[in-house]
């Protein structure tokens, strides 16, 4: 049985399989295909020629544009058809030709996306990725499996991020970057392979960081990247002023949880 709210607007040329759950005021355009295990929240708009498959849960007020593919079988050769998931939050904009693949058992079983993100044309989000809130991935950005983007990350166009890499909050990656190691919060980076070149001060201003916080973040950045010290030598000094500055504590904690190493 299809569970379709009476207020949903579904084109007669769309295919909604038995079992799909469609919320209030959802719109589904012509030639879109919604699989039997899909749940779509209220006021989400699905334009024409979109395919949503697998055990996929989509929240409210999302916009999904033409030729996007969500919840399809992932490209991990170990995948054996297990009922893994894609879970997407609210108010995301998923533009044309975006692909978001379902998770794997080995990676926790879920590809997870938060709220208020923008994925521009041709973005690829592979299995088991975890994306926070208010991130932007520009045209042709590619995330390999198990990549994590914390909140407020911007990924420049034509960039690629290696599997298992973690990108910290408020990071700005320049266009065409190839990222193979973790990028700490607040950092701007670019290149092949990506290298740090400063603190994302403009982004921090836009998000309401005050001058003392930004000054402390810059000092922490300089200790890591410009003092000539190793990370192990710099961390005790950063700990001294992280006590009174939560923004620096976030920076410090990132180094302690990194498993792939930090870009230098």
From Swiss-Prot:
Gene Ontology MF term list = acyl-[acyl-carrier-protein]-UDP-N-acetylglucosamine O-acyltransferase activity
Q: Which family does it belong to?
A: Belongs to the transferase hexapeptide repeat family. LpxA subfamily.
The protein depicted here goes by the name Acyl-[acyl-carrier-protein]--UDP-N-acetylglucosamine O-acyltransferase
Q: In which pathway does it act?
A: Glycolipid biosynthesis; lipid IV(A) biosynthesis; lipid IV(A) from (3R)-3-hydroxytetradecanoyl-[acyl-carrier-protein] and UDP-N-acetyl-alpha-D-glucosamine: step 1/6
Catalysed reactions listed for this entry: a (3R)-hydroxyacyl-[ACP] + UDP-N-acetyl-alpha-D-glucosamine = a UDP-3-O-[(3R)-3-hydroxyacyl]-N-acetyl-alpha-D-glucosamine + holo-[ACP]
Its annotated compartments are: Cytoplasm
List keywords of the entry alphabetically. Acyltransferase, Cytoplasm, Lipid A biosynthesis, Lipid biosynthesis, Lipid metabolism, Repeat, Transferase
Q: What class of enzyme is it?
A: transferase
Pfam families cross-referenced by the UniProt entry: Acetyltransf_11, Hexapep
Q: Which HAMAP family match?
A: LpxA
Q: Which sequence ranges are marked TM in the entry?
A: none
Q: Which Gene3D superfamilies match?
A: Hexapeptide repeat proteins, Udp N-acetylglucosamine O-acyltransferase, C-terminal domain
Its primary localisation, in coarse terms, equals cytoplasm
- GO cellular component term of the entry, any: membrane
Q: How does it assemble?
A: Homotrimer.
Q: What is its EC number?
A: 2.3.1.129
Task of the protein? Involved in the biosynthesis of lipid A, a phosphorylated glycolipid that anchors the lipopolysaccharide to the outer membrane of the cell.
User: Is Cell cycle included in the keywords of this UniProt record?
Assistant: no
Q: Name one GO biological process term.
A: lipid A biosynthetic process
């Amino acid at each position: 049985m299809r569970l379709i709210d009476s207020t949903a607007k579904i084109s007669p040329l769309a295919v909604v399989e038995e079992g799909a759950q469609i919320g209030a005021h959802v719109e589904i355009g012509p030639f879109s295909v919604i699989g039997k295990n899909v749940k779509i929240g209220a006021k989400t708009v699905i334009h024409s020629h979109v395919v949503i498959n697998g055990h996929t849960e989509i929240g409210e007020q999302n916009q999904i544009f033409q030729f996007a593919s969500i919840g399809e079988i992932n490209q991990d050769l170990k995948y054996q058809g297990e009922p893994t998931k894609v879970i997407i939050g609210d108010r995301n904009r998923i533009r044309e030709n975006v692909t978001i693949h379902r998770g794997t058992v080995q990676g926790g079983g879920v590809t997870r996306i938060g709220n208020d993100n923008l994925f521009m044309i041709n973005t690829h989000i592979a299995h088991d990725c975890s994306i926070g809130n208010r991130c932007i991935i520009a045209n042709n950005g590619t995330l390999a499996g198990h990549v994590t983007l914390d909140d407020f990350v911007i990924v420049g166009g034509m960039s690629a991020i290696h599997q298992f890499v973690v990108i910290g909050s408020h990071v700005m990656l320049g266009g065409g970057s190839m990222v193979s190691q973790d990028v700490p919060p607040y950092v701007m980076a670019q290149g092949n392979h990506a290298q740090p070149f400063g603190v994302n001060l403009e982004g921090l201003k836009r998000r309401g960081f005050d001058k003392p916080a930004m000054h402390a973040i810059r000092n922490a950045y300089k200790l890591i990247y410009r003092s000539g010290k190793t990370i192990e030598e710099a961390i005790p000094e950063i700990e001294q002023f992280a006590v009174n500055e939560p923004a620096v504590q976030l920076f410090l904690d990132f180094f302690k949880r990194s498993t792939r190493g930090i870009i230098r």
